[in-house]
Amino acid sequence: MLMTKPPVPQLNLTVVREAAERAARAIPPLWPLESSVAVNPFLGQTGEPLAMAAARLRRVAGAAVTMPRTWYAERIASGELSDVDLAAAIDAAPPTTRPLTIAELKRAAQIEIAPPQALPTVAELASAVSGFDWTGFVAERISAWASGYFDRGQALWAAPKGPNAYAAWRLTATHDLTPEIFGLTGFAADVAAAPESADAALIRAVEQLGLSEAASESYFHRLLISLGGWAQLARYRLWQAELSGSTDTAVTDLIAIRAVWDSTLLRKYQPQIAAEWTDAINGYVQPLQPTEDDHINAILQDAVERAAQRKLQTVLAASAQPKPDDRPALQMAFCIDVRSEPFRRALESLDPRIRTLGFGGFFGLPIAHRRFASDVVEARLPVLLPPRVTTSCSGHTHAHEANDRAKRVAARAKRAWGRFKLAAISSFAFVESMGPVYVAKLLSDGLRSGTRRTNADPAPQFDPPLALGARVDTAEAVLRAMSLTGPFAPLVLIAGHGASVVNNPHASALHCGACGGFPGDVNARLLAGLLNDPQVRTALIGRDIAIPADTLFVGALHDTTTDAVTLYDADHPSPAHASALAQTRDWLATAGALTRSERALRLPRAATGGAIARRARDWAEVRPEWALAGCRAFIAAPRPHTSGRDLQGQAFLHDYDWRKDTDFSVLELILTAPVVVASWISLQYYGSTVAPETFGAGNKLLHNVTGGIGVVEGNGGLLRAGLPWQSVHDGERLVHQPLRLSVLIEAPHEAISTILDRYPEVRALFDNRWLHLFALDDDGRMNWRYVGDGGWEHADNPPTNQRVASFE
């Protein structure tokens, strides 16, 4: 019997367009490889609690948002997850959704549930009845086009661009006979007959699919998920455009493109799949409703996080370190990155006169930077912010200018040689003829025990120079935000961080997220120069910040892969500080050795700290460092309340003294910038662990770079976003425990609430428990827990213990 087409509803273009816009904003952005940063994969779901997000992502992605039940059951059996934790999680859940007893929750943890299943697309239904993988075929054809369209210089033949993504795809698809060869007769003609505008094409496809306006948003979200990283890359373009007050349609164009594929497949397979497709449409229309299992999973996840918070309470309840009143011999400011914590702990253990502090690694300088001998502008600041000043490393002296020209010529020659190596007519011949020439270099690179040392760029400078008033305002704002207003040591290091790895497409993800995926050396050197400026220092005295004449600021770079620290003391030569610098280098070397020994215990095949540097140069090493795996806490408090405590490299540490923050402007900055950045990092690790197929980048061993923008697994397919599996798993067990971040701030909880009320999007992270929030008392103890909707409750604390506990 011939099935009739689904009824064609009357559609409102504005309503459908708005549904596409909402679906687009439910997708997280994906930054290109050159500046990749961690992104919260649940960015579009932070306005709803975990159970509701579970229902949504099950429908559109077939993805879990929590671990398998066995994971929780194992922790209950081991005692790690106690009855106290389970009871507290039950009490915190909405009354209508929680089990009645702890025993019921434990029984539920023993029952494994079916994996989530997404609603089907037409391509999936066509695959099921035809025996041909239309789902994979559509993904492959769109990927083949997208890799050329979004290319950033890797492709040797440029793809047609067109005025927008839809127009460019349409131009390509009308000449692509591959679908016809594989049986989709008339595809090119269908595309040619489609409207020229993406909006009109989308309406046409939706009508042909028989979708209602009510079904559109979920269906559009489903289509974007089916495109993997390509949809996220398009979302990145919209993100960047909106930062500059513009817009971009690539992500909604992708919805139209993917819908055209489905409508064409429905025309071919409608007699076989009409009933199933009608059922799917009805599923897309249904209001989202979490299941009982969704609520139980959310409660179990909350319980595990409460268990971790209980351990952290014990660590912080240990007696605080006394705050020395004498002048320190050395102060060193680090990025808040969790990898800084072990190094800071090791460095402070060497001498009581050493003080460290934590601050966002861009050090309050929102710069667009041009490196020496380069015209490429790098946004070295959090991706949440637009650059406000420009800087460069060229033009200091005639010698620098000559060197700049020479390096530019060398760089152009290197690029030309590289393109020749990749060219279709020469690539194989190149390997045959030139391979032996590279033997010595390959052996040298592979056998070198340490990291490659490169000559530093000249000291960066503001370009154009900032007026004195702007320099003073910037210096004051940064020092107050760092809670660094005195006393000052004779030597103050400002240390950014970066990573030294080879053969790693995701190398920028190991650099500083607060610097937009670049190393933090430029920002550190800029701030050191600003604070060494005599005019700035004189003006700061009038603002109650007196920097002693014998204090020298020096920029530095902490290599998180090797724990070596580079000092840029040549930027500001000071013979008077030669002895202090020599002593500091000794301290840094010793602290680096201690930190490497600690890290070696966690890294596979790194029996000693000495193996760490060799790993950085190993082409085959998929785990040169663990990066931010294990991150679980963000603490903003005076350093004495965290110093001496073993936080296992799992806490972001931000120095903050609310008593100096009279208007709570620094508290506002912390809650709206570094806390949000840390949440993106934490939730990227969380998503890549609980649902690696959806939110992870797959297997590093299979990665190939495409378009200079991202990676695919193998020879093609969808762009992969998120973290590779090797970043969260050591081959035998998880090294990242998927826990939502606990944010601890030493400040009056009333002040925290006032700021959250001004920023609904930040408050939503806490109201919906994507983050946990605690206010610390004046002794650094977890005193208040935020319970949502502006409410707080007293947090139970263990008795004060003189012994310093471990976070493990």
From Swiss-Prot:
What does the entry list under GO cellular component?
plasma membrane
User: Mind listing the UniProt keywords for this protein, alphabetically?
Assistant: Cell inner membrane, Cell membrane, Membrane, Metal-binding, Transport, Zinc
Q: Which residues bind Zn(2+)?
A: C335, D337, H497, C512
Q: Which cofactor does it need?
A: Zn(2+)
Query: According to its UniProt record, where is this protein mainly located?
Result: membrane
Q: Where in the cell is it found?
A: Cell inner membrane
Its domain of life reads Bacteria
Q: What does the record give under GO molecular function?
A: zinc ion binding
How does this protein lie in the membrane? Peripheral membrane protein
HAMAP family, A to Z = DabA
Q: How does it assemble?
A: Forms a complex with DabB.
Q: What does this protein do?
A: Part of an energy-coupled inorganic carbon pump.
Query: Which family would the database say this protein is a member of?
Result: Belongs to the inorganic carbon transporter (TC 9.A.2) DabA family.
Q: Spell out the protein name for this chain.
A: Probable inorganic carbon transporter subunit DabA
- What is the scientific name of the source organism? Rhodopseudomonas palustris (strain ATCC BAA-98 / CGA009)
Q: Which gene encodes it?
A: dabA
